[in-house]
Amino acid sequence: WEKFNQRYTRRIRSVVKREVKKFRDCGDLKKGYRLFVCEGCHDVKKVAFRCKGKFCPTCATGESQRWAEVAANDLFTVTHRHVIFTIDEGLREIFLKEKYRKELLKGLMDEAARILLDFFRKHHIQAGVVATLHTFGSQLEYNPHVHLVVTMGGLTKDGKWKDYDYFPFAMLRKYWQNAVLKLIRRPLSQWDKARVQPLLQAAYTKNAEGFYVHAPKRSRTSLKKILEYISRYMKRGPIALNRILLYDGKIVMFQYHDKRTNTDKIKTMSAEEFIGAL
């Protein structure tokens, strides 16, 4: 990390440096601790303060589990569906621009939730949605996409529950595509709009059926399981320690699941590339 930080310090966001420092200091007695003394035998035990950071695999695991439990208790015990909204690969670099990143990434969540809620409103139903943003894929590549947990039904104007278990995928995909392309242009300067226009046009032409939206008919697992899956990416770092197979000081080898082929694969990167991906 020291070499990486020294080499790319101007490009590393302050929040990243802060999280890494918290993680490296986590559990260090020199940074502070709680002292427990047994009143009977007077045995003394020091428990170091934890960082509670997202980047820390120890702290983030507990935070992830707690979030899933709290969220599950807050949601109605009705049928839910896990929906994933993705964007064209050629557009990802636009969401990396520091000048627009925050607005564009928040906009992705807002637009995905709006499209689903508008669909149910047309059927006179107020549905419930939990939206979370994920900015990376299983290979640690930058891949902003939105995960949503949506009720399969909702409340009518008179407060009664009405089931509705149907999604018109063709419509959702085109609506989502149009929403993303408009979202990208919204905050950009005229110069930046002209620069990214070829990317927008290519993404539109390449995806004649719209951007990919994945929503299994019904989840085969419980609502809590869906939330646990989502929270792993929202409350934890990009990769779990058990996926790292090898580190020799120079290279990192880790395992990932290829959803296209439904198989586990291995990827090898230099230590510098790995830190940069994180």
Where are each of the predicted segments found?
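Beta->alpha loop/short-helix hinge microenvironment recognizer with preference
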Residues: 1-278
